[in-house]
Amino acid sequence: MQKLLNFVIVTICIIFINCSNSSTNPNANIVRDLTTAEIKLTESDNKFGLKLFKEIVNSEENKNIFISPLSISMALGMTYNGADSTTLEAMHETLEYGDLTTQEVNESYQSLIKLLTELDPKVIFDIANSIWYREGFSVENDFIGLNTTYFDAVVRALDFNADSAADIINEWVSEKTNGKIEEIVDKPIDPLTVMFLINAIYFKGTWTYEFDEENTTDDIFYLPDGSETQCKMMSHKNDHNYFENEQFQAIDLPYGDAGFSMTIFLPKPGIDIDSLIAQFSNDSWNSWISSFSSQEVNLYLPKFKMEYEKSLNDVLCTLGMSIAFDPYQADFTKINSDGNLYISNVKHKTFVKVNEEETEAAAVTSVEITLTSVGETGITMCINHPFIFVIRENHSGTILFIGKIVEPEWED
């Protein structure tokens, strides 16, 4: 019988500004300060990403989850440029844009994409955007112009009636994720679908302090129901940024020149992982991160690898965007002035692999637009029970991934 996947990895790609020492590594690259608008956008994306994370965890208890809110935010950010009236207002509120203007949102995404992808020469972090629309469907020039200028989006018309259309889009997705995600559009394309807005993200970072494969052993991982499973447990002893309180231990594991890192939250015995996740907010996150300090840690971390897929329609409706999914109320007249358009599906797929040498992760988000139908010594941290992990960029405070693991799996 196939073993039940019983852990959750949620990858949040949100952007926010750290209030304190996001990295104490002296080798970290020195980069420019964020603008006021960029700071506001990072804070907005942080709020959106954390509430999205918590909503998905609430809806998928004890399941493997892995999402990229940065990918989701960017795909919806492009779509936002086509919204108007109450649909625009609902998306603005759901995405937590606050007092940011559309121009400020666009300009900040443009500059942050450049900053994030050029930050650390020892880490591969790529962001790609594209818009694919049905041949013969009229698209407003302003909509295309905004997304090509600020999101560097590739824009192309295709014959959606041909099977080759889905193949072309999926080939682009596979290329931009280094083959880790091969398909986002299914065949045949719905005859009423007129557009796909797609974001793809790829991350590959080598640990600053790699794990020795010779130290990896078969070990026990404790599941939420109290049962046990086997895992491949890596280990090493190093100085790391570390913090603990009454509820959890936390450690920060840098990649490359420490421009990016994975932050892991391990609930202490008796603390439910979902109750800890419920406490995640801008304030709590900033408070926790500012409390880290360098300490010698005996670390035990399981290897894991997984893929994940989810339609985000229900979650986004719960968070306040339901009008955008309503065929008769949605207003996307900035995409096409005739209107009669709505979001029929927001599809999200991800991949992650963590081993002794590196972390590799990828995410794709597709927003489908459809026509309305007329019808040892020192500290020891042994991660052998459910834990939370976050991969982040340390200058802007971008959370690239945030995960909840209740059962790590590894297959060679």
Predicted regions and their residues:
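Non-catalytic, conformational "gating/processing" segments within enzyme and secreted inhibitor domains
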Residues: 102-268, 290-375
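Detector for small/aliphatic-rich hydrophobic stretches
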Residues: 2-160, 405, 409-411
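C-terminal soluble interaction/assembly domains
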Residues: 345-412
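Beta-sheet entry/capping signal
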Residues: 63-64, 194-195, 261, 388, ...
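Extracytoplasmic/secreted cell-surface and envelope-processing proteins
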Residues: 87-91, 271-274, 308-310, 362, ...
